[in-house]
Swiss-Prot record:
Keywords: Cytoplasm, DNA-binding. It holds the Pfam family YbaB_DNA_bd. It is found in: Cytoplasm, Nucleoid. This is Nucleoid-associated protein SCO3619. NCBIfam families: DNA_YbaB_EbfC. One of its GO terms (molecular function) is DNA binding. The lineage of its organism: Bacteria, Bacillati, Actinomycetota, Actinomycetes, Kitasatosporales. Belongs to the YbaB/EbfC family.
Length: 115
């Protein structure tokens, strides 16, 4: 309902929905191009992912490589990738959160949004 008791203008609502859809698509494209980093072991292992969570790079400092202890290296790689993905999720919330609120939700239940 519109203040004053009038009915909502369907054309206006449709235009608003189309604009929100375009804004969402633009933000998702921007996220796919943006890269964020995560690290573990004090920077011995660094992972780079896109804002949408795609792993793009992994850098391992030679100091982290111990042939006798590959398990620790594996743990550092997992931790770095998880940190990068957490940073990507934070970026997603920054970019897409305001759009989700504009669609009447707090970010929950909207297809394509991970939060």
């Amino acid at each position: 309902m519109i203040p004053g008791g009038g009915q909502p203008n369907m054309q206006q609502l449709l235009q608003q929905a189309q604009k929100m859809q375009q804004d969402l698509a633009k933000a998702q494209e921007e996220l796919a191009r943006t890269e964020v980093d995560g690290q573990a072991g004090g920077g011995l292992v660094k992972a780079t992912v896109t804002g949408s969570g795609e792993l793009r790079g992994l850098v391992i400092d030679p100091k982290a490589v111990d042939p006798e202890d590959t398990e620790t290296l594996a743990d550092l790689v997992v931790a770095a990738v998880q940190a990068a993905n957490e940073n990507a999720q934070n970026l997603q919330q920054q970019k897409l959160g305001p759009l989700a609120q504009g669609m009447g939700g707090g970010g929950s239940g909207i297809p394509g949004l991970p939060f």
